[in-house]
Swiss-Prot record:
Post-translational modification: Both N-myristoylation and calcium-mediated conformational changes are essential for its function.
Phenotype upon loss of function: Hypersensitivity to abscisic acid in the early developmental stages.
UniProt site (Involved in dimerization): S140
Record CDD domains: EFh (cd00051)
Gene designation: CBL9
Similarity comment text for this entry: Belongs to the calcineurin regulatory subunit family.
Tissues where the protein occurs: Ubiquitous. Colocalized with CIPK23 in root tips and vascular bundles in the stem and the leaf, as well as in guard cells and root hairs.
Protein name: Calcineurin B-like protein 9
Topology term for the membrane: Lipid-anchor
Database matches in Gene3D superfamilies: EF-hand
Length: 213
């Protein structure tokens, strides 16, 4: 958990105490305070209501409020812990914690499993992996032939689906990740280790600030 000793932790009206959030995450109090500045910037980019809606989240992640993106939608759904269609500051900090370099392998593995388990069945199915792969390729502007995508899916399930039931359960996914740690690269944002030295450059992109002004 983060170092949460502070003599002058700021209070954020209508939001959770930074000391409390630091005690529950890998962030220090000063890092939580820096995250609050980021949260304010994102949450006011479209509607200034102290909450992050899906449009603001997509704008922060991908600089584009018009283009729907499955990956962004899934991340938003996982951040939206209370299922209200918006993200409050507490959920924002706790959810970002899984991307911290000090977050455990277990936390990161669980998050990626839920990311791919789009139907919330407790299993990752081939079509879910295909949808996510296509979404990630589109976002990176990479193009792969359909047969290449199918080959990737075949190899993934050959390696991960140990009991050959056509789906990947949590145990199979955990073992697959251990053998293929590169799968978790997206789950670590190094600058989360000390946001206070990188803010305001720590932001998914700088366009949020430009739109807010």
């Amino acid at each position: 958990m983060g170092c949460f000793h502070s003599t002058a932790a700021r209070e954020f009206p209508d939001h959770e105490n930074p000391v409390k959030l630091a005690s529950e995450t890998a962030f220090s109090v000063s890092e939580v305070e820096a995250l609050y500045e980021l949260f304010k910037s994102i949450s006011s980019s479209v509607v200034d209501d102290g909450l992050i809606n899906k449009e603001e989240f997509q704008l922060a992640l991908f600089k584009n409020r018009k283009k729907e993106n499955l990956f962004a939608n899934r991340i938003f759904d996982l951040f939206d812990v209370k299922r209200k269609g918006v993200i409050d500051f507490g959920d924002f900090v706790r959810s970002l914690n899984v991307f911290h370099p000090n977050a455990s392998l277990e936390e990161k593995t669980d998050f990626t499993f839920r990311l791919y388990d789009m139907d919330c069945t407790g299993f990752i199915e081939r079509q879910e992996v295909k949808q996510m792969l296509i979404a990630l390729l589109c976002e990176s502007e990479m193009k792969l032939a359909d047969d290449t995508i199918e080959m990737i899916l075949d190899q993934t399930f050959e390696d991960a689906d140990v009991d050959r039931d056509g789906k990947i359960d949590k145990t199979e996914w955990s073992n697959f990740v251990i053998k293929n740690p590169s799968l978790l690269k997206i789950m670590t944002l190094p600058y989360l280790r000390d946001i206070t030295t990188t803010f305001p450059s720590f932001v998914f992109n700088s366009e949020v600030d430009e739109i807010a002004t």
